[in-house]
């Protein structure tokens, strides 16, 4: 990504018709605190989609193609990078996403964006961050909703799933990187905060359902495949915490399983009809 200081872009790519723009901006001082903005010319304010990539919290993944797709559907799109697990422990990743949102809203006029009509889309590890934005504080006041594809909504569940003799390589990779994210192994007995932040408190904070509060949280559309290595139970547990534990309306969290598929994260958008479902869900809320 090209470095942008303040509001000045070092690189802007426009379409031949000068109707489409792509620019990289910095929303913080760390090299990872950048975002790519995609938008088309508009005579009116439009809704926004903030994309948080996956990659086990430790690597990046490209979202340019889908960012352009969503921009062509009438939205201003922001593909956000954040500090990875070897850069900083949790909750730095959630803090970065919050900072990016603040920057986007403050600069909404540049993109013909309505700052009150923003949805967050997260994939895999990015889905964990995205859903945490829905439940952290009054998420419903911050954003209009979250679409999460294979969200690792419970890194603790993922740690356990990856800690068996028959665990797959991908399950172990999630386990190991969740451990790096927390900077410790999950141990309910480790509650000592005198020398460090409590390990167990960090793991509990990483589990999205633990911050569920019902009506204060943003609505969510959570999607997994039937053979996903991040199983749908992650999202079902979050749905139960919101709708059963905290009386969120029954349509506050929608969980969908794509049958006959093992697609994961952004790969779910290659499923027939899924991009249309996602766009329909977003537009119904913005």
Please name every model-derived segment.
Residues 1-14:
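Secretory targeting and sorting signals
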Residues 14-286:
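Alpha/beta-hydrolase superfamily serine-hydrolase fold, recognizing
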């Amino acid at each position: 990504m090209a470095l942008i200081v303040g509001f000045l872009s070092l690189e802007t790519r426009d379409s031949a018709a000068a109707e489409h723009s792509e620019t990289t901006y910095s929303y913080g001082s760390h090299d990872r605190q950048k975002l790519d903005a995609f938008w088309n010319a508009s005579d009116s304010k439009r809704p926004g989609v903030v994309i948080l990539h996956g990659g086990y919290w430790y690597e990046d993944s490209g979202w340019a193609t889908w960012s352009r797709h969503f921009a062509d559907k009438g939205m201003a799109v922001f593909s956000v990078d954040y500090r990875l697990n070897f850069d900083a422990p949790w909750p730095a990743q959630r803090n970065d996403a919050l900072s990016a949102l603040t920057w986007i809203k403050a600069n909404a006029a540049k993109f013909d964006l309505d700052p009150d009509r923003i949805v967050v889309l997260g994939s895999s590890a990015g889905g964990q961050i995205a859903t945490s934005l829905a439940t952290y504080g009054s998420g419903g006041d911050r954003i209009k909703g979250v679409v999460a594809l294979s969200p690792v909504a419970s890194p603790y569940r993922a740690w356990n799933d990856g800690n068996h003799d028959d665990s797959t390589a991908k399950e172990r990779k999630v386990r190991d990187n969740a451990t790096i994210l927390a900077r410790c192994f999950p141990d309910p007995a480790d509650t000592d905060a005198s020398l460090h932040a409590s390990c167990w408190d960090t793991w509990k904070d990483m589990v999205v359902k633990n911050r569920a509060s019902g009506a204060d949280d943003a609505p969510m559309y959570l999607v997994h495949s039937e053979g996903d290595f991040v199983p749908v139970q992650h999202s079902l547990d979050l749905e139960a915490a919101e709708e059963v534990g905290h009386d969120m309306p029954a349509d506050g969290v929608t969980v969908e399983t794509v049958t006959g598929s093992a697609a994961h994260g952004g790969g779910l958008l290659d499923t027939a009809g899924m991009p249309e479902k996602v766009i329909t869900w977003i537009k119904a809320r913005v």
